[in-house]
From Swiss-Prot:
Residues annotated to bind substrate: 25-30, 45-49, 74, 125-126, 151-154, 274-279, 292-294, 298, 360-361, 374-375, 381-382
Record: residues binding ATP: K7, Y8, G9, G10, S41, S174, D175, Y180, T181, A182, D183, P184, R185, K210
Gene Ontology process terms (BP): diaminopimelate biosynthetic process; homoserine biosynthetic process; lysine biosynthetic process via diaminopimelate; threonine biosynthetic process
Record annotation: effect of changing D345G: Decreased sensitivity of AK activity to concerted feedback inhibition by lysine and threonine
Class of the enzyme per the UniProt entry, highest EC level: transferase
Gene name of the encoded protein: lysC
Lineage: Bacteria, Bacillati, Actinomycetota, Actinomycetes, Mycobacteriales
Pathway linked to the protein: Amino-acid biosynthesis; L-lysine biosynthesis via DAP pathway; (S)-tetrahydrodipicolinate from L-aspartate: step 1/4; Amino-acid biosynthesis; L-methionine biosynthesis via de novo pathway; L-homoserine from L-aspartate: step 1/3; Amino-acid biosynthesis; L-threonine biosynthesis; L-threonine from L-aspartate: step 1/5
Source organism: Corynebacterium flavescens
Keyword Protein biosynthesis found: no
Keywords: Amino-acid biosynthesis, ATP-binding, Diaminopimelate biosynthesis, Kinase, Lysine biosynthesis, Nucleotide-binding, Repeat, Transferase
Subunit record text: Tetramer consisting of 2 isoforms Alpha (catalytic and regulation) and of a homodimer of 2 isoforms Beta (regulation).
PANTHER family: ASPARTATE KINASE, ASPARTOKINASE
Entry protein name: Aspartokinase
Activity: how regulated: Low feedback inhibition by lysine and threonine. The decreased sensitivity of C.flavum, as compared to C.glutamicum, is probably due to the Asp-345-Gly sequence difference.
Length: 421
């Protein structure tokens, strides 16, 4: 008997009809001879609606109370799914994150999972019940306060539970039926991938793919939890994410896909002193504010005045905070200026085959040249090339790269209505 963990996103649970459909799928999995644990996101746009409601009563709500509010969304869908399962004649028991043993750091709004002790879930499974766990949430062991795991936290909850329960597979259901070679909404002939290594999925998640959040893939790789990305709208087997890139024979290594990211902004510090430790001050201040930095470029030092310019990207959502921090440092460091640009996007090419194909970088640049796309920043890894470009050029760049590396097929991809979650 296999143990299957299934996670359903908000689009899969957005209405009573969708919840009943999900319940039927869950019960069918149980009847096939599996033990089943289900992790639920909040219904549809519930989380966004709760955020708007909070802002209406308090523009700067206390972080603890915000977590108390937001976790209600998952508890609602949790209970409704359990009710729907019971209506089909199967036994179900719902759990909050804390009841399921999800222990976290105490940082409200973006806590990290430190341990999972799913004793009550194991007991319910032993009794033959289907277990329904609220995603996106946990509890801090010291304060006993409810915490949330940040956007995409339900994915991480599902993978963490799968690891703690030694599940055979963790299935992530949304409104897309797998991982594609590109966003089908941008590249119509994008093709679904049957299998990816953890490293390839990590790179895709890190550079913009919204199918899985980065933290969930990191957790899956660390504990070797096989992931399967599937659609709740079809019975397609989806995409399997398992194994290491090192296990792929060199002859079989391929270019995986093109990822796009519309969430970054570019910040440039002009006229900073080109001395040891000056750049460190910039990035330490941002790190202390928990602002993630992605691409970084430092220009050649000016011989005349011993200064340089530093350009980097950060999440657009953190842009205002980053600028406030840097404007204060500008006065102290006597910098020339700090510039902010949110009219930029990022496009990336990912694939294990990049290691064994020396001409990939040249072809990448030539493909963008041919559609008149200018490159502002470049970053690379062993299996990835990313560039920052003007936001108006993103779609053309993605299509050009997809065509250049022959990643498409003859048929157009099937796109279900929804957001990819």
């Amino acid at each position: 008997m296999a143990l299957v963990v299934q996670k359903y996103g908000g689009s899969s649970l957005e209405s009573a009809e969708r919840i009943r459909n999900v319940a039927e799928r869950i019960v069918a999995t149980k009847k096939a001879g599996n033990d089943v644990v289900v992790v639920c996101s909040a219904m549809g746009d519930t989380t966004d609606e709760l955020l708007e409601l909070a802002a209406a009563v308090n523009p700067v709500p206390p972080a603890r109370e915000m977590d108390m509010l937001l976790t209600a969304g998952e508890r609602i869908s949790n209970a409704l799914v359990a009710m729907a399962i019971e209506s089909l004649g199967a036994e179900a028991q719902s759990f909050t994150g804390s009841q399921a043993g999800v222990l976290t750091t105490e940082r409200h709004g973006n806590a990290r999972i430190v341990d999972v002790t799913p004793g009550r879930v194991r007991e319910a499974l032993d009794e033959g019940k289907i277990c329904i766990v609220a995603g996106f949430q946990g509890v801090n062991k010291e304060t006993r306060d409810v915490t949330t795991l940040g956007r995409g936290g339900s994915d991480t909850t599902a993978v963490a539970l799968a690891a703690a329960l030694n599940a055979d597979v963790c299935e992530i259901y949304s409104d897309v039926d797998g991982v594609y070679t590109a966003d089908p909404r941008i590249v119509p002939n994008a093709q679904k991938l049957e299998k990816l290594s953890f490293e390839e999925m990590l790179e895709l998640a890190a550079v913009g793919s919204k199918i899985l959040v980065l933290r969930s893939v990191e957790y899956a790789r660390a504990f070797n939890v096989p992931l399967r990305v599937r659609s709740s709208y079809s019975n397609d087997p989806g995409t399997l994410i398992a194994g290491s890139m090192e296990d792929i024979p060199v002859e079989e290594a391929v270019l995986t896909g093109v990822a796009t990211d519309k969430s970054e902004a570019k910040v440039t510090v002009l006229g900073i002193s080109d001395k040891p430790g000056e750049a460190a001050k910039v990035f330490r201040a941002l790190a202390d504010a928990e602002i993630n930095i992605d691409m970084v470029l430092q220009n050649v030092s000016s011989v005349e005045d011993g200064t340089t310019d530093i350009t980097f990207t950060c999440p657009r959502a953190d842009g205002r905070r980053a600028m406030e921090i840097l404007k204060k440092l500008q006065v102290q460091g006597n910098w020339t200026n700090v510039l902010y640009d949110d009219q930029v996007d990022k496009v990336s090419l990912v694939g294990a085959g990049m290691k064994s194909h020396p001409g990939v970088t040249a072809e990448f640049m030539e493909a963008l040249r041919d559609v008149n796309v200018n490159i502002e920043l470049i970053s690379t890894s062993e299996i990835r090339i990313s560039v920052l470009i003007r936001e108006d050029d993103l779609d053309a760049a993605a299509r050009a790269l997809h065509e250049q590396f022959q990643l498409g097929g003859e048929d157009e991809a099937v796109v279900y209505a929804g957001t990819g979650r």
